[in-house]
């Protein structure tokens, strides 16, 4: 186990009350969170989303990506279902950090795509560690999920880490003229499944 469960509190939202659970990485002290809606116990697979932190999309409403749209849609789906989990994976910018993400945006403004921009900065296309998320599911007592994602790599890594993904639920929202090239690049170079 790479994390420990350290705190929890009620989080009232326009969609209803979630339980916010805080986790801490044992090696680094970095924190992550999960929003739990309803009763996630029992044998029925839980609707879940692993959402990687995106300050620009989630909080600042950027149109450069689909992250904020996905966050809102995932929470709505979970609330409508009556039970589920959203893991808020605190690895900003596919885990290159906010400052490098801003640098990558500047490179994209010069014509690089999102993958090329990461490479120009010395990073892989995706630096995230989804095994942490598998540990969060386990600490919540969940090992079977219906995963809201377009990323087959996320499914593969979580499965290898012991989470049974019984269904991949597409989450295709937020396409606009500002992020078309970004989404096309994610499909072409990173294998994301973005066609309905």
UniProtKB/Swiss-Prot annotation:
It catalyses: GTP + 4 H2O = 2,5-diamino-6-hydroxy-4-(5-phosphoribosylamino)-pyrimidine + formate + 2 phosphate + 3 H(+). Its EC number is 3.5.4.25. GO terms for biological process: riboflavin biosynthetic process. It is an enzyme of class 3 (hydrolase). Zn(2+) binds at residues 54, 65, 67. One of its GO terms (cellular component) is cytosol. InterPro entries: GTP_cyclohydro_II, RibA, RibA-like_sf. Homodimer. Catalyzes the conversion of GTP to 2,5-diamino-6-ribosylamino-4(3H)-pyrimidinone 5'-phosphate (DARP), formate and pyrophosphate. Belongs to the GTP cyclohydrolase II family. This is GTP cyclohydrolase-2. It comes from Salmonella typhimurium (strain LT2 / SGSC1412 / ATCC 700720).
